[in-house]
């Protein structure tokens, strides 16, 4: 399935199950479901998402190193302040989440980021550090994997085991993908109208 299909379908699933009752919850739900719906394809070497995450990881670590350097040199106490605040877990969580994504990006496509292990590690990190977004993120990831099971290329759900699973009913750019996308757009529109 294409990225656009995963993006829309993940939101249909998350909004249908969570049914947020205000704009803030709607935005949080849709954002987390969108990230969950496309994070599994970070391992596609040619994708723009792969390049964007490479850049984000590089910038994040560069800023962290620069921040630490200036914190020590000028004695700002920034890292002590973060360590003593409630945001400490959030910073650690971002670190761990990006590290897991970075690891997954460098694995073969449809392996780690399409596995139960990948789902558990990414969702577990969010549950522990950002517990507001873990459930829509999980629904987004599960919806991605659900759609990809119908593809001809197998998913390594039990990664690191080599065995893959696939129903072999469609391929990447098939009419099935187009129909799932169109039906998902209609459902998303209806859900947003009802909410």
List the predicted regions and their residue ranges.
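N-terminal membrane-targeting hydrophobic helices
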Residues: 1-195
